[in-house]
Amino acid sequence: MSADLTWLLIKNNNSFLIKRSGVQFSKEAGNLLNLNTFKFSGIANKKTIDIAAAASGRGVVVSTPKTKVTLTKGIRKSARSVAGLTRAGYRADLRQAALARVAAVLATQKPVKVAAKKASKGVRANKN
């Protein structure tokens, strides 16, 4: 079945579709922006890229329909390899979305800095 025909069949009704506040989102694998559009659809297109957090909690899993690779080197090297994958003729139109997704997933894995408690100043604050 062609990609266009598949999209016509699933665009208004599928199990991944979320319709809220006049906007349609999609939870399908391979949809980088989670938007219900033909360009980003993981079901309608043959060539898809799925980027998700690694199960170990460190790194990202980049998967295509044929391969699956876990990238754990850091944000710059991960972004470079994802950009290389998309630039090499494999869905070059998804490059910006893929890089944004890698950056967002890796940003969530950074440890949260604990802010130091501010020292109280003044005569009344130090009076005990």
Model-derived segments and spans:
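Compact, Lys/Arg-rich rRNA/RNP-binding cores from ribosome-related proteins
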Residues: M1-N128
